[in-house]
Amino acid sequence: SRRGAPRPPIEPFGPLLPGCPPLDADGDVRLIEFSARRPLHPARFHEAIDVLLDGVVHARGRLWLATTPDEAFWLELAGAGLRVGAAGRWLAAGGDGSPERWAMASAAWDETHGDRRTDLVVLAAGADPARIAEALRWAELTPAELAAGPGEWAGWHDPFGAMHADPCEDL
C-alpha cells in the first residue's frame, strides 16, 4: 500500500467525498437558493440548464414554466443527470392539496398568481454562484413578457413538454 500524505483530490467534487461539505465562505462548495415570482421562459431556461450542468453537484426544486401556467414542474439534477417532469397542478389552478399544503401556500400567496413560483436549491462545487443566479434570473420573463399574459405564452416553443431528461436532443 502507498504511504505518506494523501494526495489532493483531482476532480472538482473531491471536497464532497469525506461526507459533510465545507460550506465556509472561502471554500468552493456553495449552497445557492433561487426563488422567482415570475414564470420562466422555457427556451431561456433550457439554455440556462447548461450553467447548472457545469459544477453543480445537486439541484432540486419546483419550476413555473410560462407555457404551462396550470402545471408545476419538478427539477432534479445530480451530477450530469437531469430530469424535469410534471409535479401536479398549482393550487391556484385547482390542484388538490392537503391542509398543510394550503397553509404553506397561503403564507406566500400572490393575489394574481397564487402559489405559482420557482424555488430551486443548488449545491455547487467550484461553480460561480453569481453566474448560476444570473443565468436563472435571465430565464425569468421580462416585465413586457409577463404583461403579454398566458395567451401569448402558450404559443412559445417549449423544449420541455411534459418532461425533460439529459442528454437532450432539443438544442
Description of each model-found segment:
Residues 1-112, 146-171:
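C-terminal accessory "lid"/substrate-recognition subdomains
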Residues 113, 118-162:
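Well-ordered alpha/beta subsegment
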